[in-house]
């Protein structure tokens, strides 16, 4: 909407992406802070509380009265702020909104099945959820390839030239990136604020890449690939950051609400999407290092138990391992935040070392 003030009335102030990104950030933050308490009251009245895994550490038992599905609120607030601030003829933005909304809807269906009395008390069956993720991922990848300026070239970090052209195989690769990132954030969302802050750090890094790649001068100077319109994604990124900060107001220790699958699946999928459009699919390993660490701990634990009948960790994901070892929840959370911050600072170095 604000961009059209520039077109209709010649208000040049609203033509700048950075200005509209700032507006979307504050709008999403304020909306989330306003609506989240109302949602918490509604969720408590409906007993929409976080289901606790029966084998989880003992200190988690007290969290079974904390509402979940907060992701629905902050995703809707982020989307509204974006619609209010971005150019709506930009396909990068529209596909990004689709990624956020579709994975949030999938997560909502799963959450609802777990907590609101649906017949399938365990939520969506894992195979059904996985198939639906692939369907959504492939649709979004096809839209990216055929309806944006994005090419199918494959890049690696710290190298300025593409390695090879993946052709139509890029569709499956992009879908895999989106799904992997989605599930990685979902696995990490096990402690108060643990997934929220690393997600914010990752989005800041990816937002910087998107803005610079959308600017002809900066992209040329930094030897970044340039795609028409990708800079506009900064508005959606800042909207989601603002919404996540608003959510963190209530999700920091001790949490008043959890994001649920409706939040973690959508945030992770969008991080994967941003990695794709900025050609940082491989650098996502560094940007989302905490998420990768959590996911690898699960893979190693399951593989070791199946092959050797022995566990590597006391419990997986790895944050539970440290809980059982006696680390306080606050200590685990803050240390993982520090790891995420350092990893993203390293990732930003890739802007110059190419």
Swiss-Prot record:
Its EC number is 2.7.8.13. Its main location: membrane. Pathway: Cell wall biogenesis; peptidoglycan biosynthesis. Keywords: Cell cycle, Cell division, Cell inner membrane, Cell membrane, Cell shape, Cell wall biogenesis/degradation, Magnesium, Membrane, Metal-binding, Peptidoglycan synthesis, Transferase, Transmembrane, Transmembrane helix. The chain crosses the membrane at residues 1-21, 23-43, 66-86, 89-109, 130-150, 161-181, 193-213, 230-250, 257-277, 282-302, 331-351. It is an enzyme of class 2 (transferase). Pfam families: Glycos_transf_4, MraY_sig1. CDD domains: GT_MraY. GO terms for biological process: cell division; cell wall organization; peptidoglycan biosynthetic process; regulation of cell shape. One of its GO terms (cellular component) is plasma membrane. GO terms for molecular function: metal ion binding; phospho-N-acetylmuramoyl-pentapeptide-transferase activity; UDP-N-acetylmuramoyl-L-alanyl-D-glutamyl-meso-2,6-diaminopimelyl-D-alanyl-D-alanine:undecaprenyl-phosphate transferase activity. Its cofactor is Mg(2+). It catalyses: UDP-N-acetyl-alpha-D-muramoyl-L-alanyl-gamma-D-glutamyl-meso-2,6-diaminopimeloyl-D-alanyl-D-alanine + di-trans,octa-cis-undecaprenyl phosphate = di-trans,octa-cis-undecaprenyl diphospho-N-acetyl-alpha-D-muramoyl-L-alanyl-D-glutamyl-meso-2,6-diaminopimeloyl-D-alanyl-D-alanine + UMP. It is a multi-pass membrane protein. It is found in: Cell inner membrane. Belongs to the glycosyltransferase 4 family. MraY subfamily. PANTHER family: PHOSPHO-N-ACETYLMURAMOYL-PENTAPEPTIDE-TRANSFERASE, PHOSPHO-N-ACETYLMURAMOYL-PENTAPEPTIDE-TRANSFERASE HOMOLOG. Catalyzes the initial step of the lipid cycle reactions in the biosynthesis of the cell wall peptidoglycan: transfers peptidoglycan precursor phospho-MurNAc-pentapeptide from UDP-MurNAc-pentapeptide onto the lipid carrier undecaprenyl phosphate, yielding undecaprenyl-pyrophosphoryl-MurNAc-pentapeptide, known as lipid I. This is Phospho-N-acetylmuramoyl-pentapeptide-transferase. It comes from Campylobacter fetus subsp. fetus (strain 82-40).
């Amino acid at each position: 909407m604000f961009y059209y003030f520039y077109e209709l009335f010649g208000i040049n102030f609203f033509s700048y992406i950075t200005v509209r990104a700032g507006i979307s950030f504050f709008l999403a933050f304020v909306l989330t802070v306003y609506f989240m308490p109302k949602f918490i009251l509604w969720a408590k009245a409906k007993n929409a509380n976080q289901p606790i895994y029966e084998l989880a550490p003992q200190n988690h038992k007290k969290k079974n009265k904390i509402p979940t599905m907060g992701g629905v609120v902050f995703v809707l607030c982020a989307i509204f702020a974006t619609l209010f601030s971005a150019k709506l003829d930009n396909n990068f933005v529209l596909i990004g909104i689709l990624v956020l909304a579709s994975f949030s809807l999938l997560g909502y269906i799963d959450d609802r099945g777990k907590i609101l009395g649906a017949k399938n008390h365990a939520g969506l069956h894992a195979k059904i959820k996985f198939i639906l993720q692939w369907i959504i991922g492939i649709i979004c990848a096809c839209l990216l390839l055929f309806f944006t300026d994005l090419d199918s070239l494959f890049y690696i970090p710290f190298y300025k030239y593409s390695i090879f052209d993946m052709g139509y195989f890029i569709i499956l690769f992009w879908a895999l990136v989106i799904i992997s990132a989605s599930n990685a954030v979902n696995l990490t969302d096990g402690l108060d604020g643990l997934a929220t802050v690393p997600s914010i750090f990752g989005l800041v890094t990816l937002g910087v890449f998107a803005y610079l790649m959308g600017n002809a001068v900066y992209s040329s100077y930094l030897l970044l690939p340039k795609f028409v319109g990708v800079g506009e994604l900064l508005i959606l990124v800042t909207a989601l950051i603002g919404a996540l900060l608003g959510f963190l107001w209530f999700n920091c220790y001790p949490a008043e609400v959890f994001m649920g699958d409706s939040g973690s699946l959508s945030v992770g999928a969008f991080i994967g999407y941003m990695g794709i459009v900025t050609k940082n699919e491989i650098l996502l390993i560094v940007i989302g290092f905490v998420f990768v660490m959590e996911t690898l701990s699960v893979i190693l634990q399951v593989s070791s138990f199946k092959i050797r009948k022995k566990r590597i960790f006391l419990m997986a994901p790895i944050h539970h391992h440290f809980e059982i070892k006696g680390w306080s929840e606050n200590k685990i959370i803050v240390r993982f935040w520090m790891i995420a911050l350092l990893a993203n600072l390293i990732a930003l170095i890739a802007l110059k070392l190419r």
